[in-house]
Curated annotation (Swiss-Prot):
Record organism: Cereibacter sphaeroides (strain ATCC 17025 / ATH 2.4.3) (Rhodobacter sphaeroides)
Tagged with keyword Transcription: no
EC annotation from Swiss-Prot or TrEMBL: 5.6.1.7
Family from the record: Belongs to the chaperonin (HSP60) family.
Name of the protein this chain belongs to: Chaperonin GroEL
Reactions this protein catalyses: ATP + H2O + a folded polypeptide = ADP + phosphate + an unfolded polypeptide
Positions of the UniProt region annotated as Disordered: 526-546
Compartment(s): Cytoplasm
Binding site for ATP: 30-33, 51, 87-91, 415, 496
């Protein structure tokens, strides 16, 4: 086991604070509409330029192990806030730095760290209650756009795109962000259910210009196993031909003779038909086939349930107004399923979302809900260069997370004002002893830090701005750093999701309390550098041999 280096008391806390300051100072320059960029070197490719706090934090590793521990703890604040709320990472980092700085000063002055922690926890709980009480629901698409704009560092176009996407697919809908190959940023909305399986043969294409197979007023056969022969389903195919309607086959696979027969029938014009593989794998495939069955009002033909292809009748097939298939995706629009059954399926999946502990499973279940309940929107982010596209994509991701958080828990006044206004509940709050009171005061002071930093990044004196906002009785009064004017922040459109503000404070206070109560730090001692290997000696007598 390697030898350890142990630091105690002031020495440990000073080194830790240096690490906290290095990370927080790099992150906080990005805060607010006039926040600056941070350039991150990459081991390959162009450097990355970003205004995303968590992206900056994740890149920082310090050579001094004790300083690095402090930096990593604050990195944890940014990561946790990002995981919970998806935005607010820079605010959380600024709050954590402010609480840690003041807290360590108090410890150095001889105060009890545990009582300081109790005071900080007490104050944080009160402020969180006040933030929740102050929040109000998002009323319209315009407010959704404002939240997105603020989170995207003031780019109104991004806010509008997100509001547009959310209106089209609903709050439950899936919105994904991708890089666009062109210059423009655009939103594409896929109505109905889309899954990532394309046609099994290009011969199924009906629109040669777009290379898509488009079937209208279509029957849908859902089969759990592979189809290698069409013999068992001849009676069903005859019924479909008599009905003069197209047929889509969704199965684990359609291969060999079965696929060849379908293609020949299609080319001869006898049967409008297309075949795709079922989405997903294993149990997830079964669940997704069942989703499609409920959406289209059909049944999954499953041997587990004792069903055989030869016994399938036309009323067991699903139906949809339109199916569009390209080489990568299949989209089912306007399925004939009962609304009540679809809603029951959605609530069943929501229960699974609440119970699952896996982030991956949760994401996949949420996608299934969206496909059943709303639809899917894709925001494709464009730009002049790869570096610009990546930087904008970071901001679109942040803005999207912020708008989702706003829909969940409502909005509060933005620009750091909500924290200062919520902090007024601490004016009459006292702890059980002077050290707890000091903890409450630390939080009260720290709540001003985000507004001070926003003003500072805009080139204005943060102390003057914070003083003016604190003295105002109007809860919406604040400083708009974009235009450098004071007034009603709701009218300016400067609003924040309550969830983001709350989460930032809770996570910052939690990690800051841990650092303040730290008394010793342990790290591996650096390995002594071994001496270089010896050379080949003087070779002194060689001259005489020349």
């Amino acid at each position: 086991m390697a030898a350890k280096d142990v630091k105690f008391d002031t020495d440990a806390r000073d080194r830790m604070l240096r690490g906290v300051n290095i990370l927080a100072d790099a992150v906080k320059v990005t805060l607010g509409p006039k926040g600056r960029n941070v350039v991150i070197d990459k081991s390959f490719g162009a450097p990355r330029i970003t205004k995303d706090g968590v992206s900056v934090a994740k890149e920082i590793e310090l050579s001094d192990k004790f300083e690095n521990m402090g930096a990593q703890m604050v990195k944890e604040v940014a990561s946790r806030t990002n995981d919970e709320a998806g935005d607010g990472t820079t605010t959380a980092t600024v709050l954590a730095q402010a609480i840690i700085k003041e807290g360590l000063k108090a410890v150095a002055a001889g105060m009890n760290p545990m009582d300081l922690k109790r005071g900080i926890d007490l104050a944080t709980a009160k402020v969180v209650e006040s933030i929740k009480a102050a929040s109000r629901p998002v009323n319209d698409q315009h407010e959704v756009a404002q939240v997105g704009t603020i989170s995207a560092n003031g780019e109104a176009q991004i806010g509008r795109f997100i509001a547009d996407a959310m209106q089209k697919v609903g709050n439950e809908g899936v919105i994904t962000v991708e890089e666009n190959k062109g210059l423009e940023t655009e939103v594409e909305v896929v109505e109905g259910m889309q899954f990532d399986r394309g046609y099994l043969s290009p011969y199924f294409v009906t629109n040669a210009d777009k290379m898509t197979a488009e079937l209208e007023d279509v029957f849908i056969l859902l089969h759990e196993k592979k189809l290698s022969s069409l013999q068992p389903m001849v009676p069903l195919l005859e019924s479909v031909i008599q009905a003069q309607r197209p047929l889509l086959i969704v199965a684990e696979d359609v291969e060999g003779e079965a696929l060849a027969t379908l293609v020949v029938n299609k080319l001869r014009g006898g049967l409008k038909i297309a075949a795709v593989k079922a989405p997903g794998f294993g149990d997830r495939r079964k669940a997704m086939l069942q989703d499609i069955a409920i959406l289209t009002g059909g049944q999954v033909i499953s041997e587990d349930l004792g069903m055989k292809l030869e016994n399938v009748t036309i009323d067991m097939l699903g139906r949809a107004k339109k199916v569009s298939i390209n080489k990568d995706n299949t989209t089912i629009v306007d399925g004939a399923g009962e609304k009540a059954e679809i809603e029951a399926r959605v609530s069943q999946i929501r229960t699974q979302i609440e119970e699952t502990t896996s982030d991956y499973d949760r994401e996949k279940l949420q996608e299934r809900v969206a496909k059943l309940a709303g639809g899917v929107a894709v925001i494709r982010v464009g730009g002049m260069t790869e570096v610009e596209v990546k930087e904008r994509k970071d901001r679109v991701d942040d803005a999207l997370n912020a708008t989702r958080a706003a829909v969940q828990e409502g909005i509060v006044v933005g620009g750091g004002v909500a924290l200062i206004q919520a902090g007024k509940v601490l004016d009459g709050l006292t702890g059980e002893n002077p050290d707890q009171n000091a903890g409450i005061t630390i939080v009260r002071r720290a709540l001003e830090a985000p507004l001070r930093q926003i003003a500072q990044n805009a080139g204005v004196d943060g102390s003057v701005v914070a003083g003016k906002v604190r003295e105002s009785d109007d809860k919406a009064f604040g400083f708009n750093a974009q235009t450098e004017e004071y007034g009603d922040m709701f009218k300016f459109g400067v609003i924040d999701p309550a969830k983001v503000v709350r989460t930032a404070l809770e996570d910052a206070a939690s990690v800051a309390s841990l650092l303040i109560t730290t008394e010793a730090m342990i790290a591996d001692k650096p390995e002594p550098k071994s001496a270089p290997a010896g050379g080949m000696g003087g070779m002194g007598g060689m001259d005489g041999m020349m």
